[in-house]
Amino acid sequence: MTGAIVVAETGTGRLIYASRPLASWTPPRLFAALAEVGPACLLDSAQVHPRTGRYSILVSNPTAILSGKGQDLTWRYPHDGVERPVVGNPFRLLRDHLRRRRATAVPGLPPFQCGVVGLLGYELVRQLERLPATTVDDAGVPDLFLLSCDRCVVVDHLAGRVWAMARPAPLRQEAGGDGEARAWVAAVMERLAAGPRPTVERPFYITAPVTPHWNRTTYLTVVARVQRYIQAGDVFQVNLAQRFTAPVADGDDPWGLYLRLRAINPAPFAGFLRGDDFAVVSSSPERLVRVQGRVVESRPIAGTFRRPASAADLAATAAALRADPKERAEHLMLVDLIRNDLGRVCLYGTIAVDELLATEVYSHVVHLVSNVRGRLHPKQDVVDCLRACFPGGTITGVPKVRCMEILDELEPFYRGPYTGGLAYFSDTGAMDVNILIRSITVRAGRAFLHAGGGIVADSHPEREYHETLHKAAALVEALGEVSAATPGVVAVRNACHYD
């Protein structure tokens, strides 16, 4: 029954939930209406698709937050005002917390039924591999920022429904009381029934043009160094990224930036994370790994052509991308890497490529995409699966560890959130993690964005340089016009300065 509150036993407690038709609500409207003050996250299927973009998830008002750098971490409990420093491997701490939260799945509900949502930064790889510490961390964003939430709102886009779910606090469950959780679900249903209200978003401006760290000449020089490593036999392919920055107007709200990026470049693994003093804005097209039941899936993207200006040329461009020998070879090499990663945690003989060399179209580019799946080994869990796949081979290269050593040498700055992931870990054991490409991080008055591409032996450096600019184009367009307070620069498409 629409809006009726249901109480379900889940083994270790109860889940209280209700649902109603989605109607005219969208994930951004839900976030604007329901997200509470403070840290919050929206995982947004801005491009709906049965396989990749079915669910959107909103969490705020977390019961606990795990954040920090390296192994110097902190558990914070906002409801109690308590902070507890901890020293340890973040993957182990995450596993321990997920085990404490574990609950039986309620049939018929979306896979996320409360749990942990948030950021896994690229630098977490230093907890998995010994890498040289030569890059500079000038952005200061945590390596991880995870919200543990007993309340969530989930959209099932294919079913056209929105769900509110809540777990009573453990002590209240023991006493048989779940009034607060029930009241919250009822309040959400009442707010949804009233429908969206007009909102006025705060502006978001940059105050000077976006500038790449490397000019064209430097980028071509670095590509040549990568190709020398390839010729020496160190690696087969390296995914080299360059960073762009822009100053941000004081007090501007990154939520406005997210809305612009979503409109320009809708993507199935989009997301917005509001941290303590930073924000991550993403329109990612790529899934790192998903676990649902015992089925594991990864969806690598490798191979990019610029989207043609004319829709009439789109089919020809996609066909040319699929037929391009270099793009095909690079893609198949990375599919093999993903098969190997999944093979570390999946049952022998279950790894299969069930979609190969498909094309996906986005606002500025066309991508080659495949889908790899397997069955998780009974002795492995979602954290084992994450460790096996993280970070994605499509954004490091082949072989992965040597590529990361080379990237640490050649890229001058921490990647931070870029090429890490936004993730959910459901109390039911489900997990889904994107790869944070097409993303912007905002902190301390600056916006940081990256764009990269795979370098192989026969890469044309000039073409690779322009590919990074094409990939950055949607992000630069979303950053938009320079503030009117800065005279002389007004056009969106002139908001990036290239040397």
Where do the model's predicted regions map?
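Extended alpha-helical targeting/anchoring segments
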Residues: 1-499
